[in-house]
């Protein structure tokens, strides 16, 4: 029995050509193809500057460092995300403070954020995560950041091409961070990017990922600050350029698959479907439903050849590395036990989508659920 995977990276001839071009050039590390990728990805987002990084976690730490976040600061973020969202804060010497989430969108609840910010005098930044491909409530969060003079750093690792009120994620705060891990909406294998309209942040980020190097002397080895080696390779940059050309098509297919899944599951009341609030464009890095019998549903789908995943089974503050963090996040604690993601990637055929719908419906004793040919 062939299985329907939860993710299926699409690497084609154009990607192979781009990688071969880099190999032929002999510039395998931080070459001109990386500068080209930075420029094109920033332009895609509508941002002025792009700084490529080795991975998405590096992008987060780089953006925070470039925004001046460090020891003595706290950063408000979500408890429901991959652990890197909080790890990057701690790697800067700052401390994450976890605010609760909205029950419909699973992104930061602005009211919870404002309550924390108003009660503390050490908050320096807000780091919202555009979870599963849906932008957070950036209008309210931007208002809070302005009122309290805070940095606003977007974790857009799962949201390439998503928009909020017509503006692309990546342009909704002081800086934004993307990941190009293989399961993301586009991939470079491993890789990340910081995008920003702030030239100062861009310059500091570029130095931070390259040993604090300014290249201001005749030998090219002037280091004006302490940094890391977090550069993206040229091989990854070549992959990124090829993948970026396909991203609009990938996202359109993800959205079409999501619409068909939602249409087919609309009459299965045991599951809560993803939402797309007015003014926000979801790019469905994940199609995440909620149910109260997650293990049983996953087992049934596994028996039927449908892969699923849980993003994420444990809240960040409940991880062993976060012992001592005990935030009041009742909504997140309820949601974390119920979320499960179904296949939605662009490699799915219409028949695959129908199989997923049928398997979920069958588990709940609703075998008549189907995807309409008109959807």
Q: Predicted regions: what is each one?
A:
Residues 75-76, 89, 96, 152, ...:
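A short hydrophobic/small-residue beta-strand
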Residues 92, 147-148, 304:
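Helix C-cap/helix->beta junction micro-motif
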Residues 95-105, 309-311:
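Short beta-strand->loop structural element characteristic of the AMP-binding/adenylate-forming
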Residues 104-188, 193-195, 341:
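Active-site phosphate-binding strand-loop segment of PLP-dependent enzymes
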């Amino acid at each position: 029995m062939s299985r329907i995977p939860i993710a299926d990276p699409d690497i084609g001839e154009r990607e192979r050509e781009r990688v071969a071009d880099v190999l032929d050039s002999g510039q395998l590390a931080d070459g001109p193809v990386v500068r080209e990728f930075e420029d094109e990805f920033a332009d895609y987002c509508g941002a002025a500057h792009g700084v490529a990084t080795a991975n998405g976690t590096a992008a987060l730490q780089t953006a925070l460092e470039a925004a001046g976040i460090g020891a003595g600061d706290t950063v408000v973020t979500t408890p429901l995300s991959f652990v890197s969202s909080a790890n990057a804060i701690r790697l800067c010497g700052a401390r994450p403070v976890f605010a609760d989430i909205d029950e419909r969108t699973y992104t930061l609840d602005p009211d919870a954020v404002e309550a924390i910010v108003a009660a503390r005098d050490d908050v320096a930044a807000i780091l919202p995560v555009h979870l599963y491909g849906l932008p957070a409530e950036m209008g309210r969060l931007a208002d809070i950041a302005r009122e309290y003079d805070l940095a606003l750093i977007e974790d857009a690792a799962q949201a390439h091409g998503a928009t909020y009120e017509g503006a692309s994620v990546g342009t909704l705060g002081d800086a934004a961070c993307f990941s190009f891990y293989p399961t993301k909406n586009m991939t470079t294998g491993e890789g990340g990017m910081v995008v920003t309209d702030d030239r100062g942040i861009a310059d500091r980020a570029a130095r931070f990922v390259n040993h604090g190097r300014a290249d201001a002397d005749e030998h090219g080895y002037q280091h004006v600050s302490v940094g890391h080696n977090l550069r993206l390779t040229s091989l990854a940059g070549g992959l990124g350029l090829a993948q970026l050309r396909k991203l609009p098509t990938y996202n359109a297919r993800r959205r079409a698959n999501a619409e068909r899944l939602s249409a087919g599951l609309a009459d299965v009341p045991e599951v809560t479907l993803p939402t797309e609030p007015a003014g926000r464009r979801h790019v469905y890095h994940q199609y995440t439903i909620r149910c109260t019998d997650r293990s049983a549903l996953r087992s049934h789908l596994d028996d039927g050849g449908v892969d699923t995943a849980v993003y994420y089974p444990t809240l960040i503050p409940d991880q062993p590395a976060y012992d001592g963090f005990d935030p009041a996040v009742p909504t997140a604690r309820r949601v974390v036990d119920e979320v499960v993601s179904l296949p939605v990637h662009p490699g799915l055929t219409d028949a695959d989508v129908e199989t997923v719908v049928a398997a979920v419906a069958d588990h709940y004793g609703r075998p008549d659920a189907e995807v309409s040919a008109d959807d």
